[in-house]
């Protein structure tokens, strides 16, 4: 009976359960370490072997979940054993303390590893989403009778978007278009109104010029400050000053042109008179010579005497040439 009591005692059962639990946790940790080493090796070539890396991650997560489930059962045993401390021996208490320390260490390691794996998993999920996102933008188009559901849904979405329907809003009427003004009207509106120089303003302009020393000395800025006209700019004064200078120069230039014309006309008249006088003197001399040579008669043609004298001289020259030519022919054998 005593031996049977020892076999059926709760202390022996709890001692064996605790030892079995510790061994299972240690085995799980060994497997986790091995899988993590393999995972570190595959991380260098994760693009070439993405499925293998995913399998290792799933296996590590599964073992860690199993270890957590094993560790969650230990507080219940500890509480139950603490109630029945007189039944347990010193060996059971030592095992419990050792198991508690080991559990704390394993829990810290598991927490650190879990954080590391969660970070890696989040990075992998981000990469997968980036790889899938460009593929989602490409519509699935199939030929024949077997059209994909994605293409039909995309078509429906496109039709709804083109019609202006959304899931959260009803179709709204189009907003009326605002009539736009033509471009030339806008330019005319933006263009500054031209300055109108009325007689009063021009009189003030002339007074300012006279006080400042004349149009050749005064500057547009000085004229504007002296006039004190609201809204008058330097450019407007400058343009009006240029026009005023041209207006002043026009009468002077016309007078100079008229004097030059008169002077030229007088010179031309004087030269013409001199020529006429010389011609008249020559004709009088010719007339006197002709009258002395020719017999006096009732008809006198002074105008033809000069021409006849010229013709006779030409005829004398031709006669002399012909006579010399005939003499040369006679001399030649």
UniProtKB/Swiss-Prot annotation:
Residues 319-333 have a biased composition (Basic and acidic residues). Residues 189-249 form the HTH myb-type domain. One of its GO terms (molecular function) is transcription cis-regulatory region binding. It is found in: Nucleus. GO terms for biological process: regulation of DNA-templated transcription. Pfam families: Myb_DNA-binding. Residues 220-245 bind DNA. Residues 274-333 are annotated as: Disordered. Keywords: DNA-binding, Nucleus, Transcription, Transcription regulation. Residues 287-303 have a biased composition (Polar residues). GO terms for cellular component: nucleus. Transmembrane segments: none annotated. Probable transcription factor involved in phosphate signaling in roots. This is Transcription factor HHO6. It comes from Arabidopsis thaliana.
């Amino acid at each position: 009976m005593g031996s049977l009591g020892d076999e059926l005692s709760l202390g022996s059962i709890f001692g064996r359960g605790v030892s079995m639990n510790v061994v299972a946790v240690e085995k799980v940790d060994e497997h986790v370490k091995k899988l993590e080493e393999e995972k570190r090796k595959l991380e260098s070539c994760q693009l070439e072997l993405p499925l293998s890396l995913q399998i290792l991650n799933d296996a590590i997560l599964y073992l860690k979940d199993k270890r957590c489930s094993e560790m969650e059962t230990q507080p219940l045993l500890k509480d139950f054993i603490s109630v029945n401390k007189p039944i347990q021996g010193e060996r059971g208490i030592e095992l419990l303390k050792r198991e508690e320390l080991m559990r704390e260490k394993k829990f810290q390691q598991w927490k650190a590893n879990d954080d590391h794996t969660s970070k890696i998993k989040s990075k992998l999920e981000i990469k997968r989403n980036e790889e899938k996102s460009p593929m989602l933008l490409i519509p699935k188009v199939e030929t024949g009778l077997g059209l994909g559901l994605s293409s039909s849904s995309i078509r429906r979405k496109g039709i709804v978007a083109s019609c202006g329907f959304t899931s959260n809003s009803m179709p709204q009427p189009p907003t009326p278009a605002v009539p736009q003004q033509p471009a030339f009207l806008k330019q005319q509106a933006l263009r500054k109104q031209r300055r109108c120089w009325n007689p009063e303003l021009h009189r003030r302009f002339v007074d300012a010029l006279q006080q400042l020393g004349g149009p050749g000395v005064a500057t547009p800025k000085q004229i504007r400050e002296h006039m004190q006209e609201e809204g008058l700019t330097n450019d407007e004064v400058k343009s009006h000053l240029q026009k005023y200078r041209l207006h002043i120069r026009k009468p002077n230039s016309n007078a100079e042109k008229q004097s030059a014309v008169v002077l030229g006309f007088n010179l031309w008249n004087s030269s013409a008179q001199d020529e006429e006088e010389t011609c008249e003197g020559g004709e009088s001399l010719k007339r006197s010579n002709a009258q002395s040579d020719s017999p006096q008669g009732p008809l006198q043609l002074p105008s033809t005497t000069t021409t006849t004298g010229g013709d006779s001289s030409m005829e004398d020259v031709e006669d002399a040439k012909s006579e010399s030519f005939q003499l040369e022919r006679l001399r030649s054998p």
